[in-house]
């Protein structure tokens, strides 16, 4: 009798994706982040579901409903901080996952990569709307500043902003619709992640060498299931440590003050995971130019496959490209730091230089260096 997992229509899908899937024998821990992102998404959906049971999306009661969750609901504080810090873990895994893709040339799988870029945008949109929901000072002003950026779009801009707001300012209508979208988007993300996996399994995983691994495959289970479980345990360890010891480490104290449209906080800034893009936005004095730079800072990932000039897929055997990759990482960390600083000298010029370097590295320096490496290797 044939094994049920190989014949049952539902079990067969699970079997071919997580059990009998042929995987390269040499993929490192950098390949763990896909499964970690799946775990993060499950954590976020579950904690979010329980928060939604007690949350009210009304400007008058939103802030106090979050306070009620923390004070009166059984383990409400735990659920709330798991959700807030779970988002931070989500983005840490996302950035490492994308970084791995850039380093090892995973972007050569076009469909998988493009769905991934779409997923990144969807997660960023979800996180932004989630940050608005507690209706603290930074929630309100963050929503006001970021939605206002759309007014830079010629002709339709101001109408578009009022349409998104559902009025003439960020108010009840905005909060209600943001809650609705924040609730539905994670399920769309889950569906997109399924498509992401579907396309990945059409080609099979890449590996650190960037060479074909068809001659040397091993079954996903038990080898990589065990490896993924170790990753998940480490993720949960870091998340619970953060939640139980310093839950507000990555948050903004201003968000513990109820939203007040008449009082602007001295420094409006988003959560840490958006700071690099926020720094790029601020480094351009022109509003439309800043918005374009902001969008392009993420959208530039979609053109990575077309900027690949090397004869080798991975950076494993390309020391010059490796140096440039780590300069790019340092540049992004610099941008993240600048995004959290006030707009004054010397932060302005540092931010502008870091923004120029970011685009120069990706669009010009790295492709030229790859061509140079081809010539050095006489390929």
Swiss-Prot record:
PROSITE patterns: CYTB_CTER, CYTB_NTER. It is found in: Mitochondrion inner membrane. It is a multi-pass membrane protein. A ubiquinone binds at residue 201. GO terms for molecular function: metal ion binding; ubiquinol-cytochrome-c reductase activity. Gene3D superfamilies: Cytochrome Bc1 Complex, Chain C. One of its GO terms (cellular component) is mitochondrial inner membrane. Heme b b566 binds at residues 97, 196. Heme b b562 binds at residues 83, 182. Its cofactor is heme b. GO terms for biological process: mitochondrial electron transport, ubiquinol to cytochrome c. Binds 2 heme b groups non-covalently. The chain crosses the membrane at residues 33-53, 77-98, 113-133, 178-198, 226-246, 288-308, 320-340, 347-367. SUPFAM superfamilies: a domain/subunit of cytochrome bc1 complex (Ubiquinol-cytochrome c reductase) (SSF81648), Transmembrane di-heme cytochromes (SSF81342). InterPro entries: Cyt_b/b6_C, Cyt_b/b6_C_sf, Cyt_b/b6_N, Cytb/b6-like_sf, Cytochrome_b, Cytochrome_b_C_euk/bac, Cytochrome_b_N_euk/bac, Di-haem_cyt_TM. The keyword Translocase does not apply. Belongs to the cytochrome b family. Heme 1 (or BL or b562) is low-potential and absorbs at about 562 nm, and heme 2 (or BH or b566) is high-potential and absorbs at about 566 nm. Component of the ubiquinol-cytochrome c reductase complex (complex III or cytochrome b-c1 complex) that is part of the mitochondrial respiratory chain. The b-c1 complex mediates electron transfer from ubiquinol to cytochrome c. Contributes to the generation of a proton gradient across the mitochondrial membrane that is then used for ATP synthesis. The cytochrome bc1 complex contains 11 subunits: 3 respiratory subunits (MT-CYB, CYC1 and UQCRFS1), 2 core proteins (UQCRC1 and UQCRC2) and 6 low-molecular weight proteins (UQCRH/QCR6, UQCRB/QCR7, UQCRQ/QCR8, UQCR10/QCR9, UQCR11/QCR10 and a cleavage product of UQCRFS1). This cytochrome bc1 complex then forms a dimer. This is Cytochrome b. The gene is MT-CYB.
